[in-house]
UniProtKB/Swiss-Prot annotation:
InterPro entries cross-referenced by the UniProt entry: AAA+_ATPase, P-loop_NTPase, Spore_III_AA, Spore_III_AA_AAA+_ATPase
Keyword line: ATP-binding, Nucleotide-binding, Sporulation
Organism: Bacillus subtilis (strain 168)
Protein name: Stage III sporulation protein AA
PANTHER family on file: KINASE-RELATED (PTHR20953), P-LOOP CONTAINING NUCLEOSIDE TRIPHOSPHATE HYDROLASES SUPERFAMILY PROTEIN (PTHR20953:SF3)
GO molecular function, one term: ATP hydrolysis activity
């Protein structure tokens, strides 16, 4: 976790260094708050250190995130997060500055949430018989937060751009609005993909889908966390253009999807060939069920863990 250590104060690094290496592999988030104990999220559960964050810690972390020039973080402060080397995302919370009804930036930042990005190579391979049949099937991955949706999408992007035996690599476009799938730093993906990968980083999903089709002629597009009406419109346009799409959405089940006004149309038009439901039954990445385009169960996996 050298990339994370680079932005932390020495005293905090010393406190974190006491954690056994094996436990580090299970930590999903490091949450730092002024005047509160440092919180680690391990297997979805909070673990608190005796070390409490200070105002000086917050100032130093922010300085290191910005390379000691807050001007360079202007756009990131509007979005509320910064992506650092290694693809890790640092969420920020503090006093919001508004202008003309919109968010202009953040000040007095008192909370940091470092989401640890780990690429888990091969986790999507057990799903290939369901998701690839001579070509990639249009797929929606459904799950509540922290169930491994992004990790699974990342490996599917790797597989589609790399190929395997009897599966040729295809031109794969990632529209990465939150810089989480590819973890780009200055436009360069920090995770491992194949030769045929193109990324639109920090780009709104709906606009990015259309931009990618016009500029990069992808055969497969990967998008995380769809949910707005304009996302639905853009996805349908992509499908009509003959592009395969693999996307994710927040939800507990396929029935949740049918109830959401912004996504209901995708179900009604049978936009997807496959639906995957994820849970944390056996940890992040547990595939609970797989459905076909009509909602028929293809696999009751009883908790197959991919991640």
């Amino acid at each position: 976790m050298n990339e994370i250590a680079e932005v932390l104060p020495e005293s905090m690094k010393n406190a974190l260094s006491e954690i056994p290496e094996q436990q580090w592999l299970e930590i999903e988030e490091v949450r730092i708050r002024i005047n509160r104990p440092v919180e680690l999220i391990r297997r979805g559960q909070p673990v608190y250190l005796s070390y409490a964050g200070t105002a000086e810690d917050a100032h130093l972390i922010l300085s290191r995130l910005s390379n000691y020039s807050m001007y360079t973080l202007e756009e990131e402060l509007k979005k509320g997060y910064v992506t650092i080397r290694g693809g890790h995302r640092v969420g920020l919370a503090g006093r919001v500055i508004t202008e003309n009804g919109g968010v202009k930036g953040l000040r007095d930042i008192a909370s940091f949430n470092i989401r640890i990005a780990r690429q888990k190579l091969g986790i999507a391979e057990p799903l290939l018989p369901y998701l690839y049949q001579n070509s990639w099937l249009n797929t929606l991955i459904i799950g509540p937060p922290q169930t491994g949706k992004t990790t699974l999408l990342r490996d599917l992007a790797r597989l589609s751009s790399t190929g395997k035996k009897n599966m040729l690599p295809v031109k794969t476009g990632i529209v990465d609005e939150r810089s989480e799938i590819a973890g780009c730093l200055r436009g360069i993906p920090q995770h491992q993909f194949g030769q045929r990968i193109d990324v639109l980083d920090a780009c709104p999903k709906a606009e990015g889908l259309m931009m990618m089709i016009r500029s990069m002629s992808p055969e497969v597009m990967i998008v995380d966390e769809i949910g707005r009406m304009e996302d639905t419109d853009a996805l349908l346009e992509a499908l009509h253009a003959g592009v395969s799409v693999i996307v994710s959405a927040h939800g507990w089940s396929i029935s949740d999807l049918m109830k959401r006004p912004s996504l209901k149309r995708l179900w009604e038009e049978r936009a997807f060939d496959r639906y995957l439901e994820l849970s944390r039954a056996k940890g992040p990445g547990t595939v609970s069920q797989i459905y076909d385009k009509d909602g028929n169960v293809l696999s009751r996996t009883t908790g197959v863990k991919t991640c």
